[in-house]
Amino acid sequence: MKKSAIILSKIILILTLLLSFGMSWNNVFSNTKNSIVSREISPSLAPMLEKVMPSVISINIEGSAITRTSRLPHQFQPFFGDNSPFCQGNSPFRHSPFCHINPDSDDKKEKFRALGSGVIINADKGYAVTNNHVVENANKIQVQLSDGRRYEARVIGKDSRSDIALIQLKNANNLSEIKIADSDNLRVGDYTVAIGNPYGLGETVTSGIISALGRSGLNIEHYENFIQTDAAINRGNSGGALVNLKGELIGINTAILAPDGGNIGIGFAIPCNMVKNLTAQMVQFGQVRRGELGIMGMELNSDLAQIMKINSQKGAFVSRVLPNSSAFEAGIKAGDIIISLNRKPISSFSSLRAEIGSLPVATKMELGVFREGRIKNITVELKHSVKHNLNSENDYIGIEGVDLSDYIFNEQKVIKVDNVKPHTPASKIGFKKDDIILNVNQKLISNVDELKKFLHSKPKILVFNIKRGNDTIYLVSE
């Protein structure tokens, strides 16, 4: 009886131990399995970033910029120089000495250092894209890769109107280029990752979503068609990459809306399709050679849509067609509403302007036009701009800063000054808005293209015969 009890006790003990061991093993197996599953479903950007980071560069700039300080107290400046009310029209003081006083001081160059970011888009050629404002006025450009390698770089081309610049790393090899997406396929709500070099801290990553597309009216750049994101973009991120979760470039970080200088979750990037078009021209020509449609217009609001009898507020309203422009020759008319470009919907005049602003001369495209209750497709070939801006590195420096257009004066083909930027060579020579250029060096120049060719010959001196109001004057540049 005792033997039976002892044997039974041993059996119970063995079963208990086996059961406990089995439960422990199950727990271990279960915990291990849960750990594996947890790692599998835990989201991480690390694998994607490992591929992308080698293509993002930090940029260090050494440069110099011209600054001006006033010789005169601020309250006295309006009474001296050409802009004085006493020096206008038929004023008896027009030729007095105080009308020829320059209230500004002489130009003064100041050195500066700056930081930014960029993205390698062609590993074989060493091409990287960044913002124009990052490399503007740069005398020396040095870039650093994610692995610590450093290279000197040079500017291939830049465009202030879109804030895009293309640089080339010198004597660089074993580079990694980023894959570029199609920004036309972006949607509000898509995840974004911003990579850059904020505050010189080295490569930093932030994430967010696309908050809006086609943002404009920010007075940041000339051509505005921004991607808006809430991914933090801070100082130094300019020129850096905005990528999707596949690690593909969707935009170039360019600006933030920051009243106090910090990030409030509103950042802007230039769409990569625009970047591709502009940098391709920079590679080919060293600059952007834009075609121009040749229209003036406005956004299509509800009141205008009602008057034009269209059941939509999306499109670009054409208020004027410039003579001899691409639009004029294609048959576009004032009052037309452009609703598509190459079958792609156009949401606003700003978006149309931005789309066309990245296209080169001779580009053929199809515009969808709403006219008198019907939609009409019109083929247009972009021509050279009707209005020419000679403020380019490749133009003669003596006349930089002036906007010119072809003009008819007394039945003679001449050139009209549309605008003069302050503190530029053109303003120092004495050009003023609405001046009419009758001849240059006693040679009749009938249009802007002829003038550009003449300036490219780099004459030792330039003598401009100018009609200004009722006066005929001469402006000289040596």
From Swiss-Prot:
PROSITE patterns: PDZ. The keyword Ribosomal protein does not apply. Pfam families: PDZ, PDZ_2, Trypsin_2. Residues 116-254 are annotated as: Serine protease. InterPro entries: PDZ (IPR001478), PDZ_sf (IPR036034), Pept_S1C_Do (IPR011782), Peptidase_S1_PA (IPR009003), Peptidase_S1C (IPR001940). It is an enzyme of class 3 (hydrolase). Disulfide bonds join 87-99. Its EC number is 3.4.21.-. The active site is at residues 133, 163, 238. Keywords: Disulfide bond, Hydrolase, Protease, Repeat, Serine protease, Signal. GO terms for biological process: proteolysis. Residues 1-26 form the signal peptide. SUPFAM superfamilies: PDZ domain-like, Trypsin-like serine proteases. GO terms for molecular function: serine-type endopeptidase activity. Residues 281-372, 387-469 form the PDZ domain. SMART domains: PDZ. NCBIfam families: degP_htrA_DO, PRK10942.1. Belongs to the peptidase S1C family. This is Probable serine protease do-like.
